[in-house]
A protein has these predicted regions:
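A residue-level detector for short acidic-glycine micro-motifs
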Residues: 8-10, 67, 105
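Conserved hydrophobic positions within beta-strands
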Residues: 6-8, 65, 93, 100
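Active-site-proximal beta-strand/loop segments in catalytic clefts of secreted hydrolases
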Residues: 22-23, 50-52, 82-83, 103-107
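Short, compositionally biased
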Residues: 60-71, 116-118
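C-terminal cap/linker of serine protease catalytic domains
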Residues: 28, 53, 100-165
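Conserved active-site neighborhood of the chymotrypsin/trypsin-like protease fold
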Residues: 1-51, 55-58, 73-77, 132-137
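Short aromatic/basic micro-patch
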Residues: 19, 59, 92, 117
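Catalytic nucleophile loop of clan PA
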Residues: 83-104
Length: 165
């Protein structure tokens, strides 16, 4: 099935996350999966990475959580030995209960069984604050988070700006 007319609602370049809006169709509903609490993830826990690695559709890789606190560029990742290759990064990392515990993000080139996923706590923060990450193709700062979400123009009313001395 091919889905067209997908819109980018929000994006975060630093986390490599995007929120997409799918068109509504009366004859089709989209399934959803729960996001697990990050605090419940344990080392040794079985996990499953789903995606299309190397263009092979509908592929599942199994592994275990190696650590829940692997740091890169100021972010903590879930490290797993489930295979994460080009094509399945960006897919869900599930626990045995079918709950998403992370979004597969990267693997180490030349290193087998070294995969990493963004924990759901970052995903939940991104979703809660999606207005701060709102996508605007005409804005070069799209996807950058501001300390306070920038006001958006609505109904033709410009945002109020404060003067500084």
């Amino acid at each position: 099935r091919t889905i067209e007319d997908i819109e980018i609602e929000a994006m975060n370049d630093h986390l490599d996350l995007a929120l997409l809006k799918l068109p509504t169709e009366e004859d089709h509903s989209y399934p959803w999966v729960p996001l697990e609490l990050w605090e419940s993830i344990e080392v040794g826990q079985p996990v499953f990475a789903i995606g299309n690695p190397m263009g092979l559709e509908q592929t599942t890789s199994q592994g275990v959580v190696s650590t829940t606190q692997r740091s890169f560029d100021g972010l903590s990742y879930i490290q797993t030995d489930a295979a994460i290759n080009p094509g399945n990064s960006g897919g869900p990392l599930f626990n045995v209960s079918g709950e998403v515990i992370g979004i597969t993000n990267m693997g180490i080139l030349g290193g087998e069984a070294l995969g990493f996923a963004i924990p759901t706590r970052y995903v939940k923060d991104f979703l809660r604050n999606r207005e701060a990450f709102a996508y605007d193709p005409s804005n070069p700062n799209t996807g950058h988070r501001y300390h306070i979400p920038p006001p958006r123009q609505q109904a033709g009313i410009a945002p109020q700006l404060e003067k500084t001395q």
